[in-house]
């Protein structure tokens, strides 16, 4: 048995053996998150089929490192109740995608799944919290932590590994179109709320990706993704 398959060895020993066997392309594939998950499938009723775009990506990199937004549903993604992944279909969809990735990876490496969680899970049937700006006005970190425990359990039920959480931005310019993602203009209050949100999420076993680092809120003229004034 190859060392990377030997569960009696430490994770470090298994990873070392696996890395020594992988090509540069395969390693690169494990480090990127460029594919939009909401573009990798087509839904016909309750049937989920994988797109050629997804299959070509797996083939190019010998696997998928992180898949972003499989469950995302909003005007930007173009997914809704008619063509998106509902709670009812989430298990089948995840299993279909993960099975394909594992079977088409030379070493059977499973993908990680990342999902947007700006104020709750951004998905069909996702539980939502008030926007961050409203939550910041409560000055109640403990309550926020409990809210994210609920969100975390929902993400975990959908096999989500990474929750992308907008918790670090400081509101400097109210013209910015994403001001509601900030807890406050005050760094201390924002830090307390961010710590509470991350703590609540990670109690469920889902890893929190705290964003945006750094200075996304320091926009020029309030224009999103413009030059940042640091």
Question: What does each of the following model-derived ranges do?
Answer:
Residues 1-230:
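Glycoside hydrolase catalytic-domain context in secreted enzymes
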